[in-house]
Amino acid sequence: MGTTRAPWHTPPRSSPMTIAFDAPAADALARDSELLSAVLHEVLVEQNGAALAREVRWLHEAAAELRAGDPAADRVLVERVAALPDEQVEPVIRACALQLQLANIAEERERVRRRREYDRTGARQRESLLEAAELLRRDGADLAAAVRALHVELVLTAHPTEATRKSVLDHQLHIARMLDGLDDPRIGATDRRRLLADLRESLTLWWLTDEVRRVRPKVEDEVRRNLFFFTHTLHEAVPQVLDELERTFGVRVGGRALTFGSWAGSDMDGHPEVGAEMLSRTLSLHRTAALRLLRGGVDALAARFSHSRRHVTVSPALEASLARDEAELPTAEVLRRVHREWEPLRTKLGFVAHRLSNMLDPVAREPGYADPQELRADLWLVLDSLGSPNVARGAIRRLLRQVEVFGFHVAALDVRQSAAVVQEAVAALLPGYRQAGEEEQAQLLAEAIAEDRRGLDRRPEGAAGELLRVLDTVAIAREAFGPAAVPVMVISMVHAPSDVLAALWLTRRAGARLRLVPLFETLADLEGAPATMATLYGTPVYRDSLRAEGDRQTIMLGYSDSGKDSGFVSSQWALHVAQERLAAQAAERELELELFHGRGGSPSRGGGRTHRAILAQPRGSLSGRIRITEQGETVSARYGDPELAVRSLEQTLSAVLLASAREQPPVPGAWRAEMERMSERSRAIYRALVYEDPDFPRFFAQVTPIEELTALNIGSRPSKRSAGGVEALRAIPWVFAWTQSRVLLPSWYGAGAALAEGPLELQREMAARWPFFQSILSSLEMALYKADLGVGERYLRLVEPELAERFWPRIEREYAQVVGRVLEITGASALLDDAPALQRRLSHRNPWVDPLSHLQVELLARARAGREDAREPLLETITGIAAGLRNTG
């Protein structure tokens, strides 16, 4: 039986040089896919021989025939996988995985192409700043007020299951640039040959690079990985998107509209390698990266700004500044230039560069800048003397934007530690604390905070002692680098007011006045969050601390653990209700509330379309301010290319502007009651399977590669908080394991009966008019479409028959019920019917992902039988499937 071929199928139909680069724009994705496939085919033949390329083709064709409905192809696929010679197993896996990653690159170039076309024609792109401005004008909103209130902070995390090495990211970025060059219709045959040769070279180097790390990454590797995105793409993208915001809304946009944070190197929670030394090292790496970028930007300006005194008017302030620089910087290279007297702007920029260099030199005797404001003041002196508005809006404005947003630290570091460790530190230091109950502990802490003493009499051992050393480092760093470098302490797993008051006391005693952010993660803690905050707001010393922060309270909401606790639907509703109550509570007290969303990549951890998720926030919970985590697994997809980064940033900013400035109607009581019912029912179904059946942990361990994941060197953090089963497992590897087996159970299980038992017409009304419910259905559709229980069933050969017979039928029934009900509500004939392009892309991936899944099952069987040679190729399948589904945890 025939099947529709994916545009990146093997073997290629033509050689790279014969591909039509002048094809219509509509065919550009197919052209890029064909080109990448053709070049990979050449690389495979050159590096490993034609036999490997043939084997890859046969596996792909068998998987495609099976997808097209040919049952005989199933046997062929199974037999070919089992019969693969040992020496071909790993190369075949790598070839399939590389095809999938090349598909990702081709699709990303298509996104860039579409954005450019909208920009060229002036047409309005969905989820753009232009669309947001038009919608707000139509509603009569105050655009200037909306922009002035805007403050979006994106916090990059180090993801425990991020599967892409930085070396691979470099190759991917280079290949994307080659495709971009080939897209230019003006290039001739010589340039095309050169670009194709570069493309072939990059792909060969990638093929010869280990996809899987041979050793577990150090924390510093994760710090450098985050810095890669800041220095390679975001540094370029941010000025563009802020300029676009200013141009579209006609309002001056300051640097506070968009800022960045990072957890890599400062997140201590469950991470023994992160401590005072690592924090200090991270601060140094951030500062060095920021200063080098700024120095490079200033050097580039100096090379261009050759203005003569005869053609520009030098302001008295700039003249005075030059005189001061000459006195303070006698060794500056610019003083040796012949033309310095006649080129004042270039001379000034030379002094600026020298000051930045001094800041990079630990033994420099001449001054640098005390803070970014001093640098901005010098750049404004140059700007004021330019005279030309065209130049003023160009390179120097971009540099000023970069100084505003990234400062001397690139991204603010959040210190994070669990409430349990914070409490342990206090118990070791405060007499009588350990024996007291919650109310008495809160009272003891309030009294101790009111004393306002500095210094600590003694130091506990272990994690508690390391926390105190970190706080000492923070106090020093804030003095040296400014408060913006380390502004926040996130207290994870907050259960009670004393958890936050304990952190307040510790930070005060250590002299580190950090903004405290309680993180509510479990379902019970989310439900109890308003009561916890009410107690804190009623505690005078805590209220005084908020007053010192401008009456601003930041609260973080954890999507991961609540989803693992209660399932997707119940978790989403609990988060929604918590936000409503916390927002109302803050408004009553005239506090400015900033919600910090700990979203992940998968739907079960709050992932999905960022724009839609922001629009689904409850009424009154957004007032222009929001913090959002960008998990390691999604960062490369959203920010791996400067133009993709611009698009991702504008989608986030436009959603926050719309959600903040547009009036939202109250949610009808019937809708709330239905969501409450669905939440309770889905939670009961989910927990009955995951937590209440004592045999489920054994089934989970056998039907997914969870045990093998712990051997994969893709994150520095341990996958478990403590010894134990599902309860002890972190939410991220829990989701990753189910993604690998293609079941994606955490993203949909429990929703079937919960939806099916409710009134269909009411649910259709909710789907038509309520953004929150639309977001739930959208996330369910995506997860259900990516899930494949036919492939997941293959993993049952690894499971004890009795366990398979008990659990698999329950999973199949629930899946069928969820799919059926979602289609009934939406009125569609198939999942993702309203997104045919996405449907096609995901469907075209399956014939490459399926062989990887079959190979993974075979290799898991071998590994569990004790075959050591199965380990390396098994880990390759894990990274390949993650790339194919574009999901880890």
For every predicted segment, state its role.
Residues 43, 58, 71, 108, ...:
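Carbohydrate-active enzymes and regulators
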Residues 700-889:
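C-terminal accessory/interaction regions of large nucleic acid-associated machines
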